[in-house]
């Protein structure tokens, strides 16, 4: 017997549950489920199986679907707080639903998806199931009003995108009243779909809540920085494609200083100039049109290289976007003002329980364990995999690769119209292939980040006989290509990667479009030495004829180099954001205290506290308290405090970004940039808190018509330990 009889009686699918312990690929994970082997079942265990049984029954009733064994196994993995690696077409939607039904009585469950379309689709599909199980369910989308969002966030089970959840969290922590907040329940459990895309690929880019900034930097200065960089000789710069950095050589440093009339470019009073030059260098040499970004209707739109889609509404902060606009001779938009920011890594840490699903997590198992303490469990496929994965074809030039591609296309057409999915490594490459196919009179469709609005329609037809779709990595995730006719099913989908991606996971996601649920299919990658993948090599060993040595630099080897670099980058992002994390918690807790002050006694007490900390004298304190008791309402005092605190916090974050931008140069002097940043952030945070209190006191004195002013604050180093959460309790 594999489970206690009493527990088995609570479910109509004992074979499915028992099967869990028989799968050899999951043996190492069996200890997570020892609680189910108890001779005397605990009440919560019986409740878990009762919930599972109810969920299966309602799915059968309302959807006419019966969950596979593997989906139930996946649900147990998610419920235990791990990552379930499930291949394309294996039913992650029902797996997440079963997990939510099993765990929603413990606390709210958020099912986090990568886009509104998936969130809405799954919400509408499963709403009757959840309600039949006794749970309320909500949907949060970008287009909703705050009132509708607030209502949705009160539900037991909530569907929401990762971006919307993150921005709602940031907006709540910049709200000017408690009523304006939309997330009102504790962050209990998150089930993250495409967990590697959210916690790995997006981890390097913080979520930034921006407001309208002021024109602190003139257009002329952006243009001057760009013109200075354009004038640099090759010997004046050092590019590292592996780390995506560009730095000035000593000669380049001297050239820029002379051209701009600066004595020391990296002196404290030249930090803005250095920042502008650094951004201009990156814009010129690392940000490429139709690869990192595209230009649409006179605007720069950023491309997610891992996902191939335009990142709607996302702009680089800290002046890099303006540097690109100067480079492209576009209208330079005002730099946004950062109101609040957080990484997805630290957003995930706010939940008591997190788990996730994806088709490709095993290669990043170490990072999931190190950064999130999440184990990755591979779930077997329901049907045997029938896809044939061919060895890579290697070519010296992209022209040779294109010629081979045309031969594959001709053969597919001759065999009866085998559907082809051709995925290029960039928008630029996909558009070039489309022009080639047009010249060759090959009927095809093109889908890139430029026209992703028609994605659903194009993907829907990609599994039809005779279909040839040229696209990018955007077809590799969040799409399900179904074979639509008997001939297509007989031949199977053929996935052709033109160039390897920056990560093996991207390639595996692409391969996974073929061979879903036991379908026939094939995949192959055509790789050349001219591909973007090989731009990361820094001084590679060459043959006598000056070509890259394939034996030393296989695509797999180069991908591992990139993945190692990306891991270090994500870890670095987290380390720097951790410096801000404790400070952010202090500020958010302080804002909560301000928002929760409800009466005039709180106003006077809090004003008195601020005044003492801002070094006011006894007469000032007495005059201030007397004036406030007669002239200031609680609502107005809250508004004053919040406006000053938020404005100063925004300026503080901007200053830290400038400091962080120049930290890499500290390593040249044998110093540790992270330690330097921690020390300077600690110092400036103490000064920020003192100056904020002073600014609030000055505002209160002005309102109270008090003639005296607070004493000038002393500048001092402030230990981070002095500003823990306990300080404001």
Give the positions of each predicted feature.
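Conserved P-loop NTPase motor core
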Residues: 2-3, 7-544, 588-589
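Extended, charged helical/alpha-beta scaffold domains that provide interaction surfaces
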Residues: 294, 298-301, 313-314, 537-539, ...
């Amino acid at each position: 017997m594999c489970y206690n009889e009493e527990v088995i009686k609570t479910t109509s699918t004992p074979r499915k549950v028992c099967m869990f312990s028989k799968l050899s690929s999951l043996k190492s994970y069996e200890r997570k489920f020892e609680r189910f082997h108890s001779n005397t079942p605990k009440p919560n265990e019986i409740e878990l199986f009762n919930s599972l049984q109810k969920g299966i029954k309602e799915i059968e009733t309302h959807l006419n679907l019966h969950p596979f064994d593997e989906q139930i196994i996946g649900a147990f993995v998610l419920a235990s707080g791990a990552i379930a690696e499930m291949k394309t077409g294996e039913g992650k939607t029902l797996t997440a639903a079963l997990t939510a039904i099993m765990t929603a009585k413990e606390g709210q469950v958020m099912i986090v998806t990568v886009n509104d379309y998936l969130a809405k689709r799954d919400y509408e599909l499963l709403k009757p199931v959840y309600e039949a199980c006794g749970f309320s369910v909500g949907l949060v989308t970008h287009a909703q009003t705050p009132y509708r969002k607030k209502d949705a966030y009160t539900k037991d089970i909530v569907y929401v995108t990762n971006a919307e959840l993150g921005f709602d969290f940031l907006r709540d922590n910049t709200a000017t009243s408690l009523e304006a907040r939309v997330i009102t329940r504790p962050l209990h459990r998150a089930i993250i779909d495409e967990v590697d895309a959210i916690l790995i690929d997006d981890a390097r880019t913080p979520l930034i809540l921006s407001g309208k900034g002021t024109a602190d930097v003139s257009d002329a200065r952006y243009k001057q920085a760009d013109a200075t960089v354009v004038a640099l000789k090759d010997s004046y710069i050092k590019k590292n494609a592996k780390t995506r950095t560009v730095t000035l050589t000593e000669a380049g440093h001297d050239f820029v200083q002379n051209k701009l009339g600066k004595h020391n470019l990296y002196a404290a009073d030249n930090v803005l100039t250095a920042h502008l030059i650094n951004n201009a260098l990156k814009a010129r040499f690392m940000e490429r049109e139709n690869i990192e970004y595209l230009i649409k209707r006179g605007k720069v739109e950023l491309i997610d290289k891992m996902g191939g889609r335009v990142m709607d509404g996302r702009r680089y902060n800290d002046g890099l976007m303006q540097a690109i606009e100067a480079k492209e001779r576009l209208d330079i938009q005002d730099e946004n003002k950062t109101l609040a920011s957080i990484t997805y890594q630290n957003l995930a840490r706010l939940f008591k329980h997190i788990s996730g699903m994806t088709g490709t997590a095993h290669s990043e198992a170490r990072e999931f364990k190190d950064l999130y303490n999440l184990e990755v469990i591979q779930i077997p496929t329901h049907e045997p995999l029938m896809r044939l994965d061919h060895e890579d074809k290697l070519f010296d030039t992209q022209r040779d690769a294109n010629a081979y591609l045309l031969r594959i296309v001709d053969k597919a057409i001759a065999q009866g119209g085998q559907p082809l999915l051709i995925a290029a490594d960039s928008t630029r490459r996909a558009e070039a292939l489309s022009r080639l196919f047009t010249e060759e009179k090959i009927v095809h469709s093109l889908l890139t980040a430029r026209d992703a609005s028609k994605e659903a329609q194009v993907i829907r037809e990609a599994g039809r006989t005779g279909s040839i779709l040229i696209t990018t990595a955007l077809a590799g995730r969040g799409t399900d290509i179904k074979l639509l006719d008997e001939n297509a099913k007989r031949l199977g989908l053929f996935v052709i990667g033109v160039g390897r991606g920056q990560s093996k996971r991207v390639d595996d996601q692409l391969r996974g479009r073929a061979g879903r649920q036991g379908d026939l299919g094939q995949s192959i990658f055509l790789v050349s030495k001219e591909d973007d993948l090989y731009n990361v090599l820094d001084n590679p060993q060459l043959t006598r004829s000056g070509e890259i040595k394939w034996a030393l630099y296989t695509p797999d080897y180069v991908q591992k180099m990139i993945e190692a670099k990306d891991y270090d980058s994500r870890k670095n992002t987290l380390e720097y954001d951790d410096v801000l994390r404790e400070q952010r918690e202090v500020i958010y807790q302080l804002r909560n205290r301000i928002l929760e002050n409800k009466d005039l006694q709180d106003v006077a007490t809090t004003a008195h506290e601020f005044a003492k900390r801002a070094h006011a004298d006894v007469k000032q304190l007495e005059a201030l308290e007397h004036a406030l008791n007669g002239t200031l309402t609680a609502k107005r005092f809250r508004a004053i405090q919040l406006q000053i605190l938020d404005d100063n916090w925004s300026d503080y974050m901007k200053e830290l970004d400038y400091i962080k931008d120049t930290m890499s140069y500290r390593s040249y002097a044998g110093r540790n940039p992270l330690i330097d940043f921690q020390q300077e952030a600690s110092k400036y945070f103490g000064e920020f808190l003192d100056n904020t209190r002073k600014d609030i006191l000055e505002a209160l004195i002005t309102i109270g018509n008090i003639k005296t002013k607070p004493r000038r604050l002393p500048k001092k180093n402030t230990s981070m330990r002095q500003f823990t959460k306990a300080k404001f309790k």
